[in-house]
């Protein structure tokens, strides 16, 4: 259940604690299987042409998305609050000078180190639900974008990642259906990730309407929404994702600063 004692600093402390273990499962160029199968196709469906554009990867983690964007010609700045993740990003970006990627340490809730209107595009991949103050982050992204600039961000789908959720199974262990409960109980809760750890990562649960209303109140114009669905051709190399056709783990928004 939710715990008011958790904040962004505690969330990042846990990311630092588990960074090496989590990143071990991530391909340096494509990310983990969920990103490969679901998130990357959705993000790049919504992103405009990034060639020659100033792009902020807000919450860049180990930097795989920075590297993908830079190879498409983007001028990339990656920001993350986890110093351990940034250290890994530096290790994995061997050709950083050629790619022109700039990695900075910073909290996405307070990006004062970056100038107003300094980016054409902001992308934030699975970050906002890790922050205690998503409104501050969205207001910061709005400030950093030029007029007409685009924000594309993904989050754990609030409807299916409520404080209580998971597969309900029969006596033989077969999956019957995905259950969610306490959807309207907003706040932080501890996840069972990594699975073998006594100290899990923290997710700040908010309703879907909370996210949408905050976007509109910040001044963004909603352009598109995608609930990523795995392509049939991805099920052969990743058969475990077939059950995920029964619900949506993620939701991806495309919004614009007028």
Where do the PLM segments sit?
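Core SAM-dependent methyltransferase catalytic element
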Residues: 218-220, 238-258
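Class I SAM-dependent methyltransferase SAM/SAH-binding core
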Residues: 56-58, 62-110
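Conserved class I S-adenosyl-L-methionine
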Residues: 1-51, 64, 68, 85-88, 150-190, ...
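Short alpha-helix
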Residues: 202-225
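A short SAM/SAH-binding and catalytic strip from SAM-dependent methyltransferases
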Residues: 121-134
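A short glycine-rich, Lys/Arg-flanked "PGG" loop and its adjoining helix->strand segment in the class I
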Residues: 135-150
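A short acidic, Gly/Pro-enriched loop at the edge of an enzyme's catalytic core
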Residues: 109, 113-121
């Amino acid at each position: 259940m939710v715990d008011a004692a958790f904040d962004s600093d505690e969330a990042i402390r846990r990311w630092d604690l588990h960074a090496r273990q989590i990143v071990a499962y991530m391909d340096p160029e494509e990310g983990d299987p969920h990103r490969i199968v679901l998130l990357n196709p959705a993000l790049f469906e919504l992103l405009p042409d990034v060639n020659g554009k100033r792009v902020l990867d807000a919450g860049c983690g180990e930097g795989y998305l920075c590297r993908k964007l830079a190879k498409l010609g983007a001028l990339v700045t990656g920001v993350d609050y986890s110093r351990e993740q940034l250290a890994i990003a530096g290790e994995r970006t061997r050709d950083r000078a050629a790619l022109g990627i700039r990695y900075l340490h910073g909290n996405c809730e307070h990006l004062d180190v970056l100038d107003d209107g300094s980016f054409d595009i902001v992308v934030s991949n699975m970050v906002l639900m890790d922050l205690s103050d998503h409104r501050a982050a969205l207001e910061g992204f709005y400030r950093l974008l030029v007029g007409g600039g685009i924000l594309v961000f993904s989050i754990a789908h609030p409807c299916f990642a409520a404080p209580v959720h998971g597969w309900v199974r029969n006596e033989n262990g077969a999956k019957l259906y995905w259950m969610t409960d306490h959807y309207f109980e907003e706040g932080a809760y501890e996840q069972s990730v990594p699975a073998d750890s006594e100290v899990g990562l923290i997710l700040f649960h908010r309703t879907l309407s909370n996210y949408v209303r905050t976007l509109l109140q910040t001044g963004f114009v909603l352009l598109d929404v995608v609930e990523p669905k795995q392509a049939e051709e991805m099920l052969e190399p990743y058969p475990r994702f077939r059950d995920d056709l029964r619900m949506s783990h993620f939701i991806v928004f495309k919004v614009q600063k007028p």
